[in-house]
Amino acid sequence: MCADHGISSVLSLMQLVSSNFPVGSFAYSRGLEWAVENNWVNSVETFYSWQQQWIDGPLIYLEWPMLKRCYYYAQIRDEMNFFQCALRILSYRDTHELRLEERQRGKALSRIILQWYPFTDGGTWLSALEHSGLASIAWLGYTWSISLENLALGYAYNMLESATMAGLKLVPFGQITAQRLLRSLMERLPNDWKKSDMIADHELGNGFLLQSIASSCHETQYSRLFRS
């Protein structure tokens, strides 16, 4: 029974981080497209540095800590604090495009969730899921019995894979280079998760100013492939 349960959670995680599932989503570059257009990112090395800055800032100090908090509130069935967490995540998305992306991912995931788990206890849970893709991932992760650490690492992998595929088109570089970059970025994630697990509320924050600037400027970029 335990082995079957473990296999089921692994398969559920694989579904959740699949590129066909609306989690990281390949429609978004999160400012990378503008950074490439304006020569901030113009090589494999500068692309790698851009992703490292995302890990060292938003991932460790915002994405993972808020995922952890949402997971906890889903676990204890505290819908009001879960809802507040979803709103807080949205408030940290400091550009129009990043907020729009968060909502779009939330609405896409909530539509899928509703097909499997029709809510009968009011609209607070559903409203929270619609507000935030990250909150929706936390809710599904708990519901599917995926451990928090595996969920966090899977989420980070999905986001880095999406970014690498965007970089492959924009920088550009080849498939072999893309896989090498992704592998190198993945190797640091377990230790980074341990650091993120200790982040207190007063330490939460985005911490990637260049991405915020690039995302803001991308709103008016004339020719673009990505929504953000």
Curated annotation (Swiss-Prot):
InterPro entries: UreF, UreF_sf. Its main location: cytoplasm. This is Urease accessory protein UreF. The gene is ureF. Keywords: Chaperone, Cytoplasm, Nickel insertion. The keyword Translocase does not apply. UreD, UreF and UreG form a complex that acts as a GTP-hydrolysis-dependent molecular chaperone, activating the urease apoprotein by helping to assemble the nickel containing metallocenter of UreC. The UreE protein probably delivers the nickel. HAMAP family: UreF. One of its GO terms (cellular component) is cytoplasm. One of its GO terms (molecular function) is nickel cation binding. It comes from Blochmanniella pennsylvanica (strain BPEN). Belongs to the UreF family. Gene3D superfamilies: Urease accessory protein UreF. It comes from the Bacteria. It is found in: Cytoplasm. It holds the Pfam family UreF. Required for maturation of urease via the functional incorporation of the urease nickel metallocenter. The lineage of its organism: Bacteria, Pseudomonadati, Pseudomonadota, Gammaproteobacteria, Enterobacterales.
